[in-house]
Amino acid sequence: MSSVAKKDKPTMSVTALINWARPAPPGPPQPQSASPAPAAMLQQLPTQSMQSLNHIPTVDCSLDMQWLNLEPGFMSPMSPPEMKPDTAMLDGLRDDATSPPNFKNYPPNHPLSGSKHLCSICGDRASGKHYGVYSCEGCKGFFKRTVRKDLSYACREERNCIIDKRQRNRCQYCRYQKCLACGMKREAVQEERQRNARGAEDAHPSSSVQVSDELSIERLTEMESLVADPSEEFQFLRVGPDSNVPPRYRAPVSSLCQIGNKQIAALVVWARDIPHFGQLELDDQVVLIKASWNELLLFAIAWRSMEYLEDERENGDGTRSTTQPQLMCLMPGMTLHRNSAQQAGVGAIFDRVLSELSLKMRTLRMDQAEYVALKAIVLLNPDVKGLKNRQEVDVLREKMFSCLDDYCRRSRSNEEGRFASLLLRLPALRSISLKSFEHLYFFHLVAEGSISGYIREALRNHAPPIDVNAMM
């Protein structure tokens, strides 16, 4: 397995790159290209911190809004081919080019970790036997939604479309037909729904919280497929001449800015398609995303970094211990080493992410269902300043609390207090998030004034619609 760096949102990765990058290769300097529209990275800092940094010159870290379409291979016409991000310039960051192309790596307690079967429908790694055949979570969810909602599809080609891991979302008709041909049983879906309904009644006979069928942990787990494909090319984004970033580091920092913007764009799409979130007032949607994007991206880095933690070892006295974590996964296929983080002056943040988040998550054996539920809870925070309708947000968050509590009771019934243990990870996440954001703001890689407009524009026009029947 190739090494990967720790999880961190664009804020941390951009900051760290300032000292992690190697000097630019010899030769004439690259021509400066005009900067596209302002990029958005945001989050409110305490007023005192904001005022103390007012003297720092602003940075032009901009993004072409068309790029929010997330089309693979999109390059801005203002970015010549030679200006594509050069990962070889990033000291401490390694591209996992040797990773098997057909299998993605999963954290130790991920539902797909250790699976030896392939999905009969698309060939992805199977999470188990569902409705009669070995299948992945994506095809399982697709088949279940099709049956439960009695959906019908049409093929635009000749009803013989290729259904594999990369093309399974292109034709729903052929995907459904392949599910049937491989042996998936419609009646098994209905039987499962009846069993779940009876179980819910027995577990909470007098519960006043009615969790909708749409807002569920299962649905949120399927939505994780919205994460951008790491194999896609990134439009090159230049850091402006007035930034605090040393000139020789601006190219690699710009590359990470671009990666960060792409992840934020995917985050906007993910948030918008959470059931009922889109029914909130647009202003409230913007406020919620603006207040949580930093934590959510940092949480994703901690989740991915679990895979790169070394296993515990048994000492002579029978106790168990682990070595200091050395790798953080900034994004799929890219890792950051602890030495590089220390050289950049963010070693303390690096260690906190791995020790207070990744290690604790592994100790808890946090699975993906719990992870996505916590992400939704972070987003749906009724205490965020500026909300117009806190009650609606509070109702949604209470539903997520109920979903997570119910999941813990069903899946870990022998672990009393698990629900509370999971929630106790959130204060640490918040604290680390604020500290990492201070570094981003210092280098003016966060456009505080334009983030709200960026999110609003993405929610209105630029975020591509998600077909819930074709997710994963």
Swiss-Prot record:
Coiled coil: none
Region spans: Hinge: 192-198
Residue span(s) of domain NR LBD: 212-462
Cellular location(s): Nucleus
SMART domains referenced in this protein's UniProt entry, alphabetically: HOLI (SM00430), ZnF_C4 (SM00399)
UniProt xrefs under SUPFAM superfamilies: Glucocorticoid receptor-like (DNA-binding domain) (SSF57716), Nuclear receptor ligand-binding domain (SSF48508)
Keyword Flavoprotein among record annotations: no
A Pfam family annotated for this UniProt entry: zf-C4
Region of interest: Modulating: 1-118
Quaternary structure and interacting proteins, as annotated: Heterodimer of USP and ECR. Only the heterodimer is capable of high-affinity binding to ecdysone.
Purpose of the protein: Receptor for ecdysone. May be an important modulator of insect metamorphosis.
Family the UniProt entry places it in: Belongs to the nuclear hormone receptor family. NR2 subfamily.
Domain comment (free text): Composed of three domains: a modulating N-terminal domain, a DNA-binding domain and a C-terminal ligand-binding domain.
Protein name: Protein ultraspiracle homolog
Organism: Choristoneura fumiferana (Spruce budworm moth)
Name of the gene encoding the protein in the UniProt record: USP
